[in-house]
Amino acid sequence: LAEWAINGLAHTEGANEALLDLIKKEVAPREKLAYAVGVKRLKTAEPILLEWLKNADAPTQKAIYHALSICGSSASLSTLEKAAKAAKYEWIPETDVTACYLRLLKTMVVNDEGHIAANAAKKLLKDTDKAYVRGAALDVIIEAEGKKAVSYILAALKDSNREYRVNALRLSENIADETLYANLAKTLKAKNNKKVKADILNWFGTNHVVSQIDAVITNMDSDDEEIAIAAITAAGKIGGDTALEALIAKLNSNHADAATKALLSFNGKINNNIMKALDADKAIRIAALNLASTRSMDEATDKVFNMLTSPENDVRTAAYKALEGVVGPSDLERLSRLIEKESGKNIPQIQKAMRNAVLPLPKDKQYATVIPYVNKSCNPSLYYPVLAQAGNPESIAEILKGYNGNYKQEAFASLVNIDNIKMIEVLYNIAVNDKTNAQAALNRYTSLVAKSAHTSIRKYQLYRRALEIASDVKVQN
């Protein structure tokens, strides 16, 4: 009953005096009482807890350390410091003393004992090489001293432990100002640890440090790959015209892929610059084609079409690949003329572009848009992939006309890509009557049955029917 009463008082407002009286009388195990002190943040119990620590077992120690970390003061500092040091600042679940010591320091900062806590944290920086402990100590110093802690942040950047360096940069974000940015930029100019430079560049990018964009751009030309890529990535995050021009220029470099990624996630508008890049040197043009396509830049459509006839093979290849991202329904006429003249490797790219061109339209409208070109074509199979995407009954009928006519394999290749439940019966009939395509038809048949809205009984019947004609073990399984 005493433990129930203690727990109740711990969660009852205005019960501090009553709880303290029960603690003094030790009406329950010390471990439970210490837990209640922590919940209640009962500062007046600190002397009692410190006295109990002298002969406490491990579970009670853990409860007391926890309570002191929450409601303790500088009076508890020496005790927890010694205990944490004895534990070699390890995370020991039995007592949790290291975590409690670090939490006590933060509690002291909140309770106007920041100067004492900061001094203890500075001592801790020297006492251990554990990155996670030193990071927590640095956090205390920054919270206690604010911008006066900059020297400790800069010192952390000279440390050999990257985890600690990165953590120091992260912790500095609440006090970061132009003075800190300038000091970090000086480090970028030094010839010391290259990984430190990469860390700073990554941090500049994450925090959008516009004032240091020149320092970032300078490092884009670094001989060290990690530094160069970090600078390129940071420039994309920071944004701005200067960064944009530098990234466009990097499209013609060994780090073109990194520059492309940075531009795709660029912090700002880039379409006008990409349009200019489409008129630049070949390497930049090719990269710009990819960017224009990925960003679905319909303003680039004419330039992409013009580059389809470029005398440079790699530019033509990039232009055909880019088509799919820059076309819309109004471009189907041009695409039709293009595919009707094409007899080689570019047909799949043009077909993909045609599918994307009509994709924004409803299924019936897709069919209505493409069927005039099918009807007047000498090779209607060129349009089957577009009809398959539409997938409405009229499209299925049109493709089946080719399957039963002069375009059997071309039509079948599109039929198995139609996402329409009506294809279940069509594919079954093909599996029964077309030995060449039977297995592929059954594979698609079972896939459509599986994702259909049919009842379990109806699905069983459809599977059973397929098994009766299946000869492929994989289909049977």
Question: Which residue stretches match the model-derived regions?
Answer:
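Interface amphipathic segments
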Residues: 58, 62-63, 77-78, 94, ...
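Alpha-helical, heptad-rich or low-complexity scaffold/stalk segments
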Residues: 83, 103, 338, 409, ...
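Core register positions within helices of long alpha-helical scaffolds
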Residues: 5-9, 36-40, 67-70, 100-107, ...
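Amphipathic alpha-helical scaffolding segments comprising HEAT/armadillo-like alpha-solenoid repeats
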Residues: 1, 12-24, 31, 42-54, ...
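Residue-level detector of extended alpha-helical repeat arrays and alpha-solenoid scaffolds
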Residues: 2-3, 30, 61, 94, ...
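Beta-propeller blade termini and top-face loops
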Residues: 4, 8-9, 14-17, 27-32, ...
